Amino acid sequence: MIAILHNIRSNHNVGSIFRTADAAGCAKLYLCGITPAPIDRFGLPNKALAKVALGAEKTVVWEQVKSTLAALEKLKQEGYTIIALEQDKKAV
C-alpha cells in the first residue's frame, strides 16, 4: 500500500498519518503540494511533525513531489489500483 497526501496543511495531521502508515505497513508516502515533510525546504527537521509522528517519520519511506497527478500516473503505470478519500458534505 502506498498513500498520497494531497495538500494537507497540518503538521500534526501529517505526523499522525506517518504513525498510522507505520502501523499499517504502508510502503511509501507521497507528500504532494503544500503537504509538509519531515525535512523542511532548508534541510532541517520539521519538529512539529516529528513530535506527533513519534519516530515514524524516520522509518516510513516518503517522497515529496509537486504534482499529485504525476504521482498518480506513475503509480497507475506501475499497476497500482487507485482509491481516493475526501471529506465532503455529500460524502458517503
Regions found by a protein language model. Give the residues of each.
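RNA substrate-binding interface of SAM-dependent RNA methyltransferases
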Residues: 1-87
